Every structure is written in structure tokens, then in C-alpha cells.
């Protein structure tokens, strides 16, 4: 599929035009012949061809807008009768190049399958007539609620029915629940990092909670493939992400490593545990203090002081947001620590 987007240097080869290319689509799975004879896994409850072929627009039924941001909108929908989420990236934004990069970055996980990662079903740069979208991505429906909504008690669908409950998972975030969700997130990070992908915008709002009470990492619009960064000492464009969760080395313009996600996880775990916002004050003052004075959210709250589990959890957070990326744990030993903590206290 020839793409109108001038981003060939950043595109995985499987999304580039080829003799065998099918129309309209950025495939979420390679044909079997490209996988050394292996048969691609079947997409659950969807026709197999749709895993890599063009979007069948007649089978798309938008149900409800779940949210909107600077680059576009996300809808709950059905695709061939299966519940999905559809992200449409707008053409008319202040920074069209950033919108295009965000669209293609979402496809960094297009062929990946993991219980704690929102799966891409299909994607296309062709859109229905009259659409203001430069691209559409169909993803599995990861859940009605985000971790941010569970932590802070926001409505499940800000634009939906006012009477809907804020959380489908039943009850407040206990320490055991924090550990359970943390294990889900770190399992997802471990898988991503094993695929040389860094999320770079991990935060509660980008973690969905399914009806089965499983956390799934979503929104890969800021993600990077480490292999794509090896040719350059610094990225060719400003990195995205949320400043409150951005690792200090990224704020200083240094190189990207998986340890940046570990830092973001530490801020997220602190939010789960305290149910507070990480910082208050002017953005520039916070950015400067994080880099120059190692500013971090406070670990003096009673939850980190009054019990042994809380103290141990505070130690985990402290190690994960160390100023030096090299001193932070990677996802695997972090998973071991959290598993031990969950078994002991969860």
C-alpha cells in the first residue's frame, strides 16, 4: 500500500509498499510466507484475512466517542460485530507532522500479542469520503475505564451517560489491588522491552482496565523502536510524552532507553498508592526541579510509613525513579520484586 505520508525512514519494512502489498492497509500480521512457513495466530472472533488486509468500512459501526485529544478521537465501535476501539488521527492539527508520526508510532505494536498490551486489529491511511482523518487504527476494546479514572474517581465516559459508575472493577484501590495492577503493567513493559519498544508515555490515563480486571497498556503514539534510534545520537524530532512522568534524562535531551518507562511506572505506582497528583505548580519550575534538584513526589505519606508493605513499596518506587537510568531496575527484576511483595502481603 503506497502511503501518502512522507515518513519512510521511520516505517517498519512490513508497512512499506511491496510487490505483494494488499490495498489500503497497514497489516497487523505478516503473511505466513514471511514468517519462515509459520502460520500467523488467528485474530479472536475476527475473520483471519482482516488481520492484515484493508479495513472493511461497511463493517465498522461507531457507537460512542470515548475521548478526544490533540491528534484525534477514540470511539467505541464494532467491527464485524466484535467490540473494538477505533482511533482516528485528524488531518487538521497544529502539527500535522507530529500527527503523522503519532499514527505510525501506534503501529509499532501492530504485530504483537500480549495480555497486557492493547492489540492492533487493522490500520489504514484510507478513510471514508468526507472524513477529516489521515489514518484509522482499529484496536481490541481494552475496557471501559482507565487506571486514571479508577484512581481519581472520574466518570468512565466523560461524554457518555452521567449515571454510569466510574469503575467497573468494583471497589477502591487497596494495596493488594495496587500490586496486582502493577504486576500487569510491568508484565506489559517486560514484553515491550523484549521487543525493543519503549512506550515513552506510560501513565494512568494510558492504562486500560478490562472487564476481567486486567490492566492493558495502550496509546503508543509516543513509542519508539530502539533499533530506529541507533543511527542517531539524538532523535530527529522532539519526543512526546507527559512531562510529569518523563524521565530526567529525556528532559535533558539524552538518549532513550527502556529505563525511561521504569521511571514513568514509578510515578504511576505512586499515584495508585497515594491517589494524589504527582506535582503542583508551574510546569517549567517542575521540569527544572526534577532535573536540577531531583524533585520527586513525596514518600512521606502514611501509606509508605505505617506498615511494612507500604515501606517496601516505597523502596520499590524510590529505586525506579532514581536520577540515573543505569541505577534503575529493568522490568524483569522489578517483576520479581513485585511478585514477591504480592505473595507476601497481597
UniProtKB/Swiss-Prot annotation:
Residues in the active site? 201
Q: Where is the signal peptide?
A: none
Keyword Transferase listed: yes
Q: Domain of life of the organism in this record?
A: Eukaryota
Q: Which residues bind ATP?
A: 66-74, 87
The record's annotation in SUPFAM superfamilies points to: Protein kinase-like (PK-like) (SSF56112)
> What keywords is this UniProt entry annotated with?
ATP-binding, Kinase, Nucleotide-binding, Proto-oncogene, Serine/threonine-protein kinase, Transferase
Q: Which GO terms describe its molecular function?
A: ATP binding; MAP kinase kinase kinase activity; protein serine kinase activity; protein serine/threonine kinase activity
Which family is this sequence assigned to? Belongs to the protein kinase superfamily. Ser/Thr protein kinase family.
Q: What is this protein called?
A: Proto-oncogene serine/threonine-protein kinase mos
Organism of this sequence: Chlorocebus aethiops (Green monkey)
What does the record give as the organism's lineage? Eukaryota, Metazoa, Chordata, Craniata, Vertebrata
* Gene name of the record: MOS
Amino acid at each position: 500500500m503506497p502511503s501518502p505520508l512522507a515518513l519512510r525512514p521511520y516505517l517498519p519494512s512490513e508497512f512499506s509498499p511491496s510487490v505483494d502489498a494488499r490495498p489500503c492497509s497497514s497489516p497487523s500480521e505478516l503473511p505466513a510466507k514471511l514468517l519462515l512457513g509459520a502460520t500467523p495466530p488467528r485474530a479472536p472472533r475476527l475473520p483471519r484475512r482482516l488481520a492484515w488486509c484493508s479495513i472493511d468500512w461497511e463493517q465498522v459501526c461507531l457507537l460512542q466517542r470515548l475521548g478526544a485529544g490533540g491528534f484525534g478521537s477514540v470511539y467505541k465501535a464494532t467491527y464485524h460485530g466484535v467490540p473494538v476501539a477505533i482511533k482516528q488521527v485528524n488531518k487538521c492539527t497544529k502539527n500535522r507532522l507530529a500527527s503523522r508520526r503519532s499514527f505510525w508510532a501506534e503501529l509499532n505494536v501492530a504485530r504483537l500479542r500480549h495480555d497486557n498490551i492493547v492489540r492492533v486489529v487493522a490500520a489504514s491511511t484510507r478513510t471514508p469520503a468526507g472524513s477529516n482523518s489521515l489514518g484509522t487504527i482499529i484496536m481490541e476494546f481494552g475496557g471501559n475505564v482507565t487506571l486514571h479514572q479508577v484512581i481519581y474517581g472520574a466518570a468512565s465516559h466523560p461524554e457518555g451517560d452521567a449515571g454510569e459508575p466510574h469503575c467497573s472493577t468494583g471497589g477502591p484501590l487497596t494495596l493488594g489491588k495496587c500490586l496486582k495492577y502493577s504486576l500487569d503493567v510491568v508484565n506489559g513493559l517486560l514484553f515491550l522491552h523484549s521487543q525493543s519498544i519503549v512506550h515513552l508515555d506510560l501513565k494512568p490515563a494510558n492504562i486500560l482496565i478490562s472487564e476481567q480486571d486486567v490492566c492493558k497498556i495502550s496509546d503508543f503514539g509516543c513509542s519508539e523502536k530502539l533499533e530506529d534510534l541507533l543511527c542517531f545520537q539524538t532523535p530527529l524530532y522532539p519526543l512526546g510524552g507527559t512531562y510529569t512522568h518523563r524521565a530526567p534524562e529525556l528532559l535533558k535531551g539524552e538518549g532513550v532507553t527502556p529505563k525511561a518507562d521504569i521511571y514513568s511506572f514509578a510515578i504511576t505506582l505512586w499515584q495508585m498508592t497515594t491517589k494524589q497528583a504527582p506535582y503542583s505548580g508551574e510546569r517549567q519550575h517542575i521540569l527544572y526541579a526534577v532535573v536540577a534538584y531531583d524533585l520527586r513526589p513525596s514518600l512521606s505519606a502514611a501509606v509508605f510509613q505505617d506498615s511494612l508493605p507500604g515501606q517496601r513499596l516505597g523502596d520499590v518506587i524510590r529505586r525506579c525513579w532514581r536520577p540515573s537510568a543505569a541505577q534503575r531496575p529493568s522490568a524483569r527484576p522489578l517483576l520479581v520484586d513485585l511478585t514477591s511483595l504480592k505473595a507476601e502481603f497481597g
